[in-house]
Swiss-Prot record:
Keywords, in A-Z order: Calcium, Cell projection, Cone-rod dystrophy, Disease variant, Lipoprotein, Membrane, Metal-binding, Myristate, Repeat, Sensory transduction, Vision
SUPFAM superfamilies per UniProt: EF-hand
Outcome following mutation: E155G: In COD3; constitutive activation of GUCY2D
UniProt-reported outcome of changing E89K: In COD3; exhibits an about 6-fold shift of ionic calcium concentration at which the guanylate cyclase activity is halfmaximal
One annotated GO biological process: signal transduction
UniProt keyword Cytoplasm, yes or no: no
Protein task: Stimulates retinal guanylyl cyclase when free calcium ions concentration is low and inhibits guanylyl cyclase when free calcium ions concentration is elevated. This Ca(2+)-sensitive regulation of retinal guanylyl cyclase is a key event in recovery of the dark state of rod photoreceptors following light exposure. May be involved in cone photoreceptor light response and recovery of response in bright light.
Species the sequence originates in: Homo sapiens (Human)
Associated disease: Cone dystrophy 3: An autosomal dominant cone dystrophy. Cone dystrophies are retinal dystrophies characterized by progressive degeneration of the cone photoreceptors with preservation of rod function, as indicated by electroretinogram. However, some rod involvement may be present in some cone dystrophies, particularly at late stage. Affected individuals suffer from photophobia, loss of visual acuity, color vision and central visual field. Another sign is the absence of macular lesions for many years.
Name this polypeptide is given: Guanylyl cyclase-activating protein 1
Membrane topology of this protein: Lipid-anchor
Impact when changing Q184R: In COD3; likely benign
Length: 201
C-alpha cells in the first residue's frame, strides 16, 4: 500500500505486529470496517462525558483518512503506527488535526481547551501540575507568534518543537500506548480502561 499517511508506511511495521493487529481487528470487527460505535467499544471507551465523547469522535475522524465514515484495517494500522512509531513532526501534524475541531486550519483557544479537558478525562496524567485552562494559556502565550488568538499548523509545529516542556506534556497527554497495549494484550488491561471511563463519567 506504500505511504498511508504523512510519509509513514505500513512496511515499517514488523510482520508480527501487523499479524497481531489484524487478528485483533478482524476478531472485533469481522466486516473489516470499524464504525464510530465499534471504535469506542474496541478501545473500551464507554460512559464518557460529552467533551470526552467529542474527542473520541474527533480521533475517529482523523483516523478515517479517506473520510468514508469507517476505519478499515489499513487506516487502523497507519493510525497505530503513527501513534506508536511516528516521528515528532508527523505526530504534531496529527495532533493539530485532532485539535482543529472545526477543520478551518487553525486551532483557537476554545478548541484546544475542549480537547485537553477531554484527553485528561480519558487518559489522566498523574504528574500534571497545570489545569487544562492554565495549560491552554501557556500554549498560546508561548507559541501564538502573531498574537491573533489562533494557532496555524506552522506556529503549532515550530512552537511545540522549540519548547521541550510543551512537547513532553503534549506527548504524555496524547500517550495512547496504554490503550494500544490493551489491544495487543487482549482484555488484560480492561481494568485500566474501566478506570479511565469512570474518571471521565
Amino acid at each position: 500500500m506504500g505511504n498511508v499517511m504523512e510519509g509513514k508506511s505500513v512496511e515499517e511495521l514488523s510482520s508480527t505486529e501487523c499479524h497481531q493487529w489484524y487478528k485483533k481487528f478482524m476478531t472485533e470487527c469481522p466486516s473489516g470496517q470499524l464504525t464510530l460505535y465499534e471504535f469506542r467499544q474496541f478501545f473500551g471507551l464507554k460512559n464518557l462525558s460529552p467533551s470526552a465523547s467529542q474527542y473520541v469522535e474527533q480521533m475517529f475522524e482523523t483516523f478515517d483518512f479517506n473520510k468514508d465514515g469507517y476505519i478499515d484495517f489499513m487506516e487502523y494500522v497507519a493510525a497505530l503506527s503513527l501513534v506508536l512509531k511516528g516521528k515528532v513532526e508527523q505526530k504534531l501534524r496529527w495532533y493539530f488535526k485532532l485539535y482543529d475541531v472545526d477543520g478551518n486550519g487553525c486551532i483557537d483557544r476554545d478548541e484546544l481547551l475542549t480537547i485537553i479537558q477531554a484527553i485528561r478525562a480519558i487518559n489522566p496524567c498523574s504528574d500534571t501540575t497545570m489545569t487544562a485552562e492554565e495549560f491552554t494559556d501557556t500554549v498560546f502565550s508561548k507559541i501564538d507568534v502573531n498574537g491573533d488568538g489562533e494557532l496555524s499548523l506552522e506556529e503549532f509545529i515550530e512552537g511545540v518543537q522549540k519548547d521541550q516542556m510543551l512537547l513532553d506534556t503534549l506527548t504524555r497527554s496524547l500517550d495512547l500506548t496504554r490503550i494500544v497495549r490493551r489491544l495487543q494484550n487482549g482484555e488484560q488491561d480492561e481494568e485500566g480502561a474501566d478506570e479511565a471511563a469512570e474518571a471521565a463519567g
